[in-house]
Amino acid sequence: MTFNVAEALTDFTRRYVELWQEETGLPPASSDLYGIPSSCIERTGDGVVYWLPKLFSVHEKLSKVETALDIRLQDSIHDYYVTQLAGDMPASFEGQNLSLIQVWSDDDFIRLQENLIGHLVTQKRLKLSPTAFIATIDSEMSMISVCNLTGQVILEQSGKPKRVILSADLASFLSVIKPATSL
């Protein structure tokens, strides 16, 4: 089955929520997001917030990033970040633990754009091809990103030119990663 990015992300999120509910009887929970407002919050308790994804309500895309850097981002990057509001979601890919970065609220969307601008400015300064991060991994110096030139999903080290291709495109990557309830 072929998915576009929005469909693949929605499908992964469904699988992620189902796994949480099967294992705990509750929606996904996060202690990191406790106390931070979001329309995703279903309930709070014991220092955690229980959440479910919501449709992204802002009709803009990552236009602030594009304007700030005079760059055109891959449609897949826009679609990834404006499909839904959700908590970050742990997953695995070929034995590698990762956490998909998600937008939690409208305020978080502003912060995300600022962080993407900083990331892209650093890459430009170091003369690296532009990428947009989509997931963190256990190593603080490495991340999973989408190459803005090719649309490939890559593993990259911050500030380094070496990159490992993980998937031909973001929709395919989201379709094969496996949800996890913890890292």
Identify the role of each PLM range.
Residues M1-E140:
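A surface-exposed partner-binding patch
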Residues A135, M141-M143, L155-L183:
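A recognition module on extended beta-rich or small alphabeta surfaces enriched in W/G with H and D/E
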